[in-house]
């Protein structure tokens, strides 16, 4: 028997799990910036992983869109002066302290 409500619930759970992965990747970006700033650097690169072992698979393009939105927010609030994206998956950050 077809149970559309169950399918919808599973899809929502999948999207929620994927968003958690996006948040983990964004936290890694922030950690990378903080570590490099502590080392006295004013720039860093971050390679967005196309997959993470032991994590749910996620749509890579959706992840990049999520990260772009979050990065735009920190650009407004923090001292990030330059953000560049290099295809297929590399972010370049430069900041002014």
Q: Locations of the language-model features?
A:
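Short, compact, well-ordered microdomains
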Residues: 61-97
């Amino acid at each position: 028997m077809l149970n559309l409500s169950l399918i919808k619930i599973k899809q929502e759970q999948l999207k929620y799990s994927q968003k958690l992965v996006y948040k983990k990747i964004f936290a890694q970006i922030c950690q990378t910036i903080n570590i490099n700033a502590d080392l006295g650097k004013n720039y860093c690169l971050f390679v967005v992983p196309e997959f993470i072992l032991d994590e749910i698979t996620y749509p890579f393009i959706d992840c990049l869109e999520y990260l772009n939105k979050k990065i735009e927010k920190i650009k407004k609030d923090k001292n990030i002066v330059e953000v560049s994206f290099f295809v297929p998956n590399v972010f370049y950050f430069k900041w002014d302290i």
